[in-house]
Amino acid sequence: MILTKAQYDEIAQCLVSVPPTRQSLRKLKQRFPSQSQATLLSIFSQEYQKHIKRTHAKHHTSEAIESYYQRYLNGVVKNGAAPVLLDLANEVDYAPSLMARLILERFLQEHEETPPSKSIINSMLRDPSQIPDGVLANQVYQCIVNDCCYGPLVDCIKHAIGHEHEVLLRDLLLEKNLSFLDEDQLRAKGYDKTPDFILQVPVVMLCPLAVEGHIIHWIESKASFGDECSHHAYLHDQFWSYWNRFGPGLVIYWYGFIQELDCNRERGILLKACFPTNIVTLCHSIA
Amino acid sequence: MAAVLESLLREEVSVAAVVRWIARSTQGSEDNAGEAAALSSLRALRKEFVPFLLNFLREQSSRVLPQGPPTPAKTPGASAALPGRPGGPPRGSRGARSQLFPPTEAQSTAAEAPLARRGGRRRGPGPARERGGRGLEEGVSGESLPGAGGRRLRGSGSPSRPSLTLSDPPNLSNLEEFPPVGSVPPGPTGTKPSRRINPTPVSEERSLSKPKTCFTSPPISCVPSSQPSALDTSPWGLGLPPGCRSLQEEREMLRKERSKQLQQSPTPTCPTPELGSPLPSRTGSLTDEPADPARVSSRQRLELVALVYSSCIAENLVPNLFLELFFVFQLLTARRMVTAKDSDPELSPAVLDSLESPLFQSIHDCVFFAVQVLECHFQVLSNLDKGTLKLLAENERLLCFSPALQGRLRAAYEGSVAKVSLVMPPSTQAVSFQPETDNRANFSSDRAFHTFKKQRDVFYEVLREWEDHHEEPGWDFEKGLGSRIRAMMGQLSAACSHSHFVRLFQKQLLQMCQSPGGAGGTVLGEAPDVLSMLGADKLGRLWRLQERLMAPQSSGGPCPPPTFPGCQGFFRDFILSASSFQFNQHLMDSLSLKIQELNGLALPQHEPNDEDGESDVDWQGERKQFAVVLLSLRLLAKFLGFVAFLPYRGPEPPPTGELQDSILALRSQVPPVLDVRTLLQRGLQARRAVLTVPWLVEFLSFADHVVPLLEYYRDIFTLLLRLHRSLVLSQESEGKMCFLNKLLLLAVLGWLFQIPTVPEDLFFLEEGPSYAFEVDTVAPEHGLDNAPVVDQQLLYTCCPYIGELRKLLASWVSGSSGRSGGFMRKITPTTTTSLGAQPSQTSQGLQAQLAQAFFHNQPPSLRRTVEFVAERIGSNCVKHIKATLVADLVRQAESLLQEQLVTQGEEGGDPAQLLEILCSQLCPHGAQALALGREFCQRKSPGAVRALLPEETPAAVLSSAENIAVGLATEKACAWLSANITALIRREVKAAVSRTLRAQGPEPAARGERRGCSRACEHHAPLPSHLISEIKDVLSLAVGPRDPDEGVSPEHLEQLLGQLGQTLRCRQFLCPPAEQHLAKCSVELASLLVADQIPILGPPAQYRLERGQARRLLHMLLSLWKEDFQGPVPLQLLLSPRNVGLLADTRPREWDLLLFLLRELVEKGLMGRMEIEACLGSLHQAQWPGDFAEELATLSNLFLAEPHLPEPQLRACELVQPNRGTVLAQS
């Protein structure tokens, strides 16, 4: 699951302009049978998000919105049961869920007196039954269930995955008898930055080829693949901040990471794709 | 001066008499009349003798040590002439010694004249001498131009300068200003020259050990204070390019001067000093001249001079002991004379006896002289580190000239344990976040808190970037980080934020640079680093590895300028780049406070009669503790000096004349940033000089030119000079300072006296009240000074330049190999431990006195233990009160608040008002804290003391110790509690109130009571995320679009619902949002089942799900909704127009599943009939195709027509389990 930069690039190369559908995912799995599905999905999702971030603006010009909306209207007039919105999104290379939001906003602007608030839009996307127009509700719903990178369902899955891995990590810590403070406890104590876990007694992780081990004061669980982009963002917003306060620590990218990114070990940020097995705890007889 | 030396050489006076004469103003009674007469006539010159002697020796040796200036700094007065210049030896005139450059045409015939002149000049008041100082350029050119005359005037003793200028006729452009020595009256034109700049050393011999920028080794005579800049600013002048530039300029000019001379004189006495153009002969071709004791030219003369010189050193009449040693080592390791001596005519014995012939006529003479001097200083040598001793003992010249000395050195080496070890610091460690000082409660506002959060991160980001780049060529701190630092400082608006940041800055400073390469980690007052507890084994390996990777580092010659090595550079540059007045002020406050705190630390005093082995162990600890405190103090003081004098330093020349007077008047009004004078006085009185002086020296080393002229600081210098004089190494006796303590003080003071801003004449001017330095008769019998707190490790750590001695010897061994500045590495200290407890500041009154007295005769560990216990128990007591009394009050507050909320309804009123009400009720209870605290200390302290003291402690001592511990702990705890308990309760209650109010708010689902998984659960259920993802796939397949071959098997659906059940029953991984989505997805799935929209895999005939299968799946769903979901399930979605509309697409429409589902929902009590009726009713309002609307109406009727049989039962259910279905899913 730890990929070299070259391996990662090969996968990323295959993901250029691929729509975020389950069909695409299936093809990807066939193309890289040796990689875990979760890793592939995580990479796919990240790559797609990068792509969307790059192209986001061009879909949000008023001309673009107007043209999409007209195409949508024309489409549903012809056949309301056809996947008009989904096809439109795929055609213009935009995420279906985001396209659904775009059209929904435009629709509500037209049909309501006051411009729709963000929370109303979000609520309607979560539960399309609330959308006043039945055809649009179906179209939106179709976009959402067919989008594997954006949308409320995907967000929920990601959140659940993150939570599950934190629980997993907590269990492992308990199993190893390592006492810790979790995020909630830290927040209650007034910490300004809170990793998932701070070890109350640090441990040393031994590395097979290195003479010395690495001290670990804190552990952060990341249920995603560590690519350059996300890792640098995490370093800046989280990992270094933890280091600045608590000293060296460990990041677990459960879905793997690019090997080359694990370059701050000496500095005190260690990357792993699983819970380390070779841990040495403070031995009281020595101390 | 020369007269004195000559009468000495002629044996008219004895060495002892001369030394007495120098050291004291009056002749001792032991002097015989003849001597007294000979010397008293020269009385006025007394003070000038030592500078003269030092310069004389330097000049005499300049042919042997051709690189000249890098020679250890000369003392006041300028260089003397090279006797053996190629043009012909000096012709019998004394003036020869005053030549710097070879061609000596005009020589002084009367050495006394310049002296007299100088003396006259000196009589003026100190500050006056600053007048007439010259600008930098003048000063530089003065090297060979007229300006040099001025320099002489200003010098404190050497007669030699003037003739040096004369000795170089081509450069003698102004004869009026620079008449021959002796003829120049000390007129106002006697301007002060700049300090002489030493050419960069390029000699082949010294190339490795010579610092390239040995700027502090200029002759003392050049007045530093008259000299602007370059030298002064360069060490920290990153932001002050002018300084650097002028240094360059000076170098350049010197270079030109030299090359001019080279052209003029056939034989270069000094190799051209430029760095870039090596002489052809530089490498390799030189062969060392062997030294032979048999070929020493005039033993007696050399012996005499060596004796006088040694005596001056021993009496601390020279400013810098180690500089002289360095010089002697240079003589010892001199490789060859620059010019061939053979051509010199034989000198007659008469000539040899006087000063007219060169003192050192050959390498043999040099080595002989050096060995003579070293013999007198065996004691100092034997206290050098083991490495230096080894090199000395193995030096073949030493063996050859004095087998006895060599034998003693060898013995000293073999017995030495003074291994100075090299340790690298572990990589940077951040200051840890401590909730007690760093959390929100310590900030005035949320904004300040979050701003500081960001600042901490920016600070470390900057630090890391510096670590990564500062060694890269071309990287510039200001360019790279300056704007970011200033932007960050700009955000520090509140004063409180500044103090937070300064605390972080100071802690990080101590942590990273406490000692140059200190083991880091252990910061004062902080827990020792975990690494050091993990076993010395690993740590040792780690450090050895790092040591190997460590780059060689030169400390910059025997007398380097104050610098900021390593990480210190970061902090200096940070201060400069930040250029924030507020920051500097807060930093000074904080540094001053910490310095006072550490300086006042009650370090255990030496107990001379500790005979058992335990004391040895104790001493290890004491020494370490002392080292930590001392090194921390030095670091803090250095930065305090840097910041405090920063506004007054600049590249421009120091002011003179009236301007200077007005500046002095102004500056003398400014109170010192820290009352160092008082601290020094107290330190001397308490015999803690060994702690106070080293940090004071660091502080003063950053003083600007005006500082030494201020009365306040003059007093300090006077005290330091007296102290210096009193530290006679040979006087060792009971009650005197330990040898290594003295050595440390001599080294740091000697270094200070060489700092350019410290006027060198200060040293020689000082009237020596000298002898016994009895500051105070009531000094304690045993102070820190009498305790062996300094070891070689600490000595070398504080004074890395002492290591230059070793480099010099090593480069002798290794020949000229290696040009990188020496292979010797920087000396860094071993790891040190954290401090023990601090003394309680509360010792007042009789009890306190008694307690003090009690400790006086107990081992120091007892006191430390008691203080430690008191400190910890006191602190724990506060925490205990917090966890018990305060926590109880908070609980009360919470229940009171709940009552309020119930009575006042949802809103609960204004939170601030609520808080006030609660606090007014609860704060009075805080009064109990004192009683509880007292009780706690009483209960806990004795046990702790008992556990920590040795078992054989007498019962009475033990119980006294316990009582004192109880008292101190109680005092500490109660002082804190009485001052803070109300605020503490208030703060905690406030936090509780906001917590409660927040909990009132959103996420009722999350707060709802939830069942955990059963005890037997092994948490093997599928993960919620996996299930959502799977169901989502089914949904997307059902909604389409899909490929023709896509579909799901009925078994898969069944399995999926089974898994869903497992997941819902194992709550381990389930979080509320996931459950909500699962609930919603399950409802969607049910709607698709009802509408028969799920594509089934298999032959086309089977494309649709069998009724039976569909019912079975719906049953499973119903059971999940009923039994397993703990959150609300949005069942009404089953009857949303969109989901019912799915049926519209199927042909033929089948309504039976929907009807079945509705009935089951009612049956299971998941939805009420009325609710369903309402939903069905609203369905009619939607727009449907005609036939569909009809069928829907039929369904409604069918459902409504059913007997209300389960109704009463249902109502019961609803009561038990309030209608879940009606609750809208949050999402």
From Swiss-Prot, chain B:
Gene name tied to this protein: CDAN1
Physiological role: May act as a negative regulator of ASF1 in chromatin assembly.
Residue positions, PTM Phosphothreonine: 71
In-chain residues carrying the UniProt-annotated modification Phosphoserine: 265, 285
Keyword Nucleus (UniProt): yes
UniProt region (Disordered), positions on chain: 63-294
Cell compartment(s), UniProt: Cytoplasm; Nucleus; Membrane
InterPro entries recorded: Codanin-1, Codanin-1_C
Recorded disease: Anemia, congenital dyserythropoietic, 1A: An autosomal recessive blood disorder characterized by morphological abnormalities of erythroblasts, ineffective erythropoiesis, macrocytic anemia and secondary hemochromatosis. It is occasionally associated with bone abnormalities, especially of the hands and feet (acrodysostosis), nail hypoplasia, and scoliosis.
Record PTM N-acetylalanine, positions in chain: 2
Subunit-level organization: Found in a cytosolic complex with ASF1A, ASF1B, IPO4 and histones H3.1 and H4.
Polar residues bias (residue ranges): 214-232
Region of interest (Interaction with ASF1A/B), residue spans: 188-208
Tissue and organ expression note: Ubiquitously expressed. Isoform 3 is not found in erythroid cells.
Identification of the protein by name: Codanin-1
Membrane topology: Multi-pass membrane protein
Cited Pfam families: Codanin-1_C
Keywords: Acetylation, Congenital dyserythropoietic anemia, Cytoplasm, Disease variant, Hereditary hemolytic anemia, Membrane, Nucleus, Phosphoprotein, Transmembrane, Transmembrane helix
Ranges annotated as spanning the membrane: 312-332, 626-646
Top-level taxon of the source organism: Eukaryota
GO annotation terms (biological process): chromatin organization; import into nucleus; protein localization
Gene Ontology CC annotations of this record: cytoplasm; cytosol; endomembrane system; nucleus; plasma membrane
